[in-house]
Amino acid sequence: MVDLVIIGGGPAGLAAACKAWESGLRDILILERDKELGGILNQCIHNGFGLHRFGEQLTGPEYAGRFIDMLKNTGVKVQLDTMVLEVTPDKKVHCVSKTEGYQIIEAKSIVLGMGCRERTRGAIGTPGTRPAGVYTAGAAQRYVNMEGYMVGKRVLILGSGDIGLIMARRMTLEGAKVLACVEVMPYSGGLTRNIVQCLNDFNIPLYLSHTIVDIQGKERVEKAIVAEIGPDRKPIPGTEMEFDVDTILLSVGLIPENELTKQAGIEMDPRTKGAVVYENMKTSIP
């Protein structure tokens, strides 16, 4: 029996482990499916992290490193390269790893820190053919920042969330030509700071109330057709613009990683698709 099992070694899991240890808990186990702690922070090589927590500007890996260093001075146990398969309502965690094999870990308490995943092209129903060259912004970020692969040369970004804005800047700095950022809403979904630093500073146009109405290409993306959206949320005929691109990045929102949450029988919020939590962040299972 473990006092606290934390599923996920990203920013939420790391912060939870540090706070639990600080609060006096001594039997803590972090389960992380990747080969290192940090989660999404490891691919966020831009700065802007840590200002509130540490009083200075840090990159994502530096921010994660601060928490990892804090954990080194504790007795928190970490199990990497471990995939959690199931969480039962009676707080049994089923997981598997190369080193430990199949395990069933009983916990007094569980912190769910699985994070989220990106919406894909299929989730938003973008019409057109299905050529190579369409990526989520996060996948492109990992390829460029961690794997060392350039995903394209002429880029159009759909969605103006922060990760899309940041990737507009990153792709430009890596030598690509970002033709535009297209946003279906009449306002941007990202921070004003990111619009200024990632779009305006690089003369990348932002088209509000616009969306992609067609993707063309056989083996690889060749063109993207963009049109203005009317008050009825439908494309306005005659407003189409044609962009010659070989890459489209999607920054169209995030979805909670909630499969384990559902398995545990936790009450779900149909609006957010995540767990219903109370003021102390407890779920419906005490």
Listing of model-derived features with the role each one plays in the protein:
Residues 1-286:
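Residues forming the flavin
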